[in-house]
From Swiss-Prot:
Alphabetical list of InterPro entries matching this protein: ATPase_NBD (IPR043129), Heat_shock_70_CS (IPR018181), HscA_NBD (IPR042039), HSP70_C_sf (IPR029048), HSP70_peptide-bd_sf (IPR029047), Hsp_70_fam (IPR013126), ISC_FeS_clus_asmbl_HscA (IPR010236)
Record Pfam families: HSP70
Matches recorded under Gene3D superfamilies: 1.20.1270.10, 3.30.420.40, Actin, Chain A, domain 4, Substrate Binding Domain Of DNAk, Chain A, domain 1
The protein, known as: Chaperone protein HscA
Taxonomic superkingdom: Bacteria
Function: Chaperone involved in the maturation of iron-sulfur cluster-containing proteins. Has a low intrinsic ATPase activity which is markedly stimulated by HscB. Involved in the maturation of IscU.
Protein family according to the UniProt entry: Belongs to the heat shock protein 70 family.
Gene: hscA
CDD domains per the UniProt record, alphabetical: ASKHA_NBD_HSP70_HscA
NCBIfam families, sorted: HscA, PRK05183.1
Record-linked HAMAP family: HscA (MF_00679)
MF term (GO), any: ATP-dependent protein folding chaperone
An annotated GO BP: iron-sulfur cluster assembly
PANTHER family, A to Z: HEAT SHOCK PROTEIN 70KDA
Amino acid sequence: MALLQISEPGLSAAPHQRRLAAGIDLGTTNSLVATVRSGQAETLADHEGRHLLPSVVHYQQQGHSVGYDARANAALDTANTISSVKRLMGRSLADIQQRYPHLPYQFQASENGLPMIETAAGLLNPVRVSADILKALAARATEALAGDLDGVVITVPAYFDDAQRQGTKDAARLAGLHVLRLLNEPTAAAIAYGLDSGQEGVIAVYDLGGGTFDISILRLSRGVFEVLATGGDSALGGDDFDHLLADYIREQAGIPDRSDNRVQRELLDAAIAAKIALSDADSVTVNVAGWQGEISREQFNELIAPLVKRTLLACRRALKDAGVEADEVLEVVMVGGSTRVPLVRERVGEFFGRPPLTSINPDKVVAIGAAIQADILVGNKPDSEMLLLDVIPLSLGLETMGGLVEKVIPRNTTIPVARAQDFTTFKDGQTAMSIHVMQGERELVQDCRSLARFALRGIPALPAGGAHIRVTFQVDADGLLSVTAMEKSTGVEASIQVKPSYGLTDSEIASMIKDSMSYAEQDVKARMLAEQKVEAARVLESLHGALAADAALLSAAERQVIDDAAAHLSEVAQGDDVDAIEQAIKNVDKQTQDFAARRMDQSVRRALKGHSVDEV
């Protein structure tokens, strides 16, 4: 049965009108672009039949080249040939220099500490370099499909943080692409595999690419996959194999460690060629910088064994997080070109107790999964073929003190999904909490849509902030939202179900998203003001309680100073000056420091009364 589709507004295709979409695997070493044609996902080749595009850009004063042509210049013009730029995305210059000391580029720091690479074309940042790779892939797709792309899905490592993901989005925008979604690489592989297998049970996706390693533990059931746990290492991949082997060759050849960039590139190219050859041969002859020697697979295995072991330790942690044992895993899907290394396949097979699946091309599977997802998101799938994969069109959250909206699940999150967040009580002795579920992108309750209200009762009567309530949002594959609130110490809970998309048209959703962008600056200022007002109310509430209990600890003059500070805070909190409220809060804190210290001393004396030193 087809599901209610929750998707980005305006993406549904008219009858018989097919929109052009592509999936892009923006890899560290190689990149691919794929699309769905005649119901089948396939990667797109260049004019010479090559599907992989080396993630390399060579810059000159009058232009640049991408891919194989660029890689051919790597040894001749190292400083202007940028490769593995994905590793630099979202990182500071200091971080790059610490993590990747082997890079043969000259860097400068921008004003905010971000890296700028010196090239013949000028100073370039990683976003610009990535954009040039994306442009080349988009051009390949546009030519193959004979039309402009309506949208793309770009894959990223599961361990990419917000800065790295935002950098990828910026690169796509610079390349003139409309990003339908960023998709984690292991999830993309699971999409491709889930469509083809028809199996049910726990599956491990072992993704060892050029620059990153990811492990995902998934549960497949009737075509639906649920991510149980993920793990990995954002600074471990086949490139590290290459550098280890290059260092070994350098030592064997007696090449100085500080040799020029051309020799360094020649060493690296020789190492890459040897690694590839050793996947099929027991030994290989290496010629570099006038030296010739033999390297065996056994020697290579000794070099990389510690790195392979690191990946298996990450697998062990992911299994533990998922709550499953290795022998419960039915299949192990291998993703990434580095999984062709025999030692990797051997050790992974030993760890999981079964030979890993290699029937799906490990280089192509991520791009194929991205293409399938792009085809869905752009609106090409008829209802009868809808997958249980969709997105939340508008953020879901809760009303908090001051009329603010705290977003729990952001828009464009893939469903099914569950997210939890902890909240606490605002007043002393509070025994109930009203839960107001909101939908929208704005910062204030008045600008968002109310979905539901319910109350959690039976909260222990504790001081403000003493009770901890965990609120869990869960959206299932049908788009049904369940919200549960539970007081953690007692286990008392309340819940409600609501259909978050019900009653909203595509145009209304689009309008809400547009408003969030138009009023972004205004909303942020309003939120800052509301937060300061909430903090002022909290400070005054706490102070009034303290004065009611222990005013005797103050002299008349001291009490007057505190009362004046509190009155001033109460007055400015009625206005709209954020800085004035903040300063008034700081002033109350300053004027009450001695009072707070006396209250603490008094509490300690009361606690010790009637006890000897030995008892304490």
